[in-house]
Amino acid sequence: QVLPALAVVFTVTLLMSVMLWVLKAVYGTPVSQFGVYLQSHIRFNTYIGLTSMALIFGAAGMQVFAMIIAFVIPLVNVLSVLGFSQGQGLSYKNIAWSVAKNPLILACLVGIIFNFSGMHLLESMSQSLKLVAGMSLPLGLLCVGAALQFNALKYAGRALILNTFGRLIFVPILAYVGCLLFGLATFETMIVVVFFSLPTASAAYVLTKYFQGDSQLMAAIISLQTLCFGLTFPLWMWFLQ
């Protein structure tokens, strides 16, 4: 059941990226802003995603979500870096290394290996990890709150609005259509649409700053998307019900 969901996620992510690159060519968007636009539409906040999946779908939903992010995180990281690559003298070896050492990717890969190999942890180690896991989501949400930059919302404009609601409304619609075309079951459809309704990752600001992109706009988009998610997410859940 995970493979069709992965197919939709990859298709929508790549399609959204291609659409943005086409718009960049048409409107001559500067690289410093294009990287922001791209991240705003394809990256996602893992902590909010895990919390949402745990509360709404339980263990089954978290398992599917974990499989999705394990394969999608490398893709969105590479695409995000490529969004800033023009004229940056980018080393593809450095891209591969930065993706390979991403702790979220490593954690997901280890989990997948254990899941498919049938190996089991010692009971004492398993209990310890369960305690850590119980703390991880609340701590992750605290980090999300701490990363919000409300002053950046003064950086208002059409780009802020378009990149906020493009992510929270247009991309989930695209995902829902993709689920219908791929014939996904209701459960997987809900997970995929919820995945694409998540706000962009707080780490997008760090990458934007590193490549000397429009970090002020990125901070504003992250903050507004995260705030508006509280309004759009219930609407999507109502629609999917």
Give the ranges of each region predicted by the language model.
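Alpha-helical transmembrane segments of multi-pass small-molecule/ion transporters
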Residues: 1-241
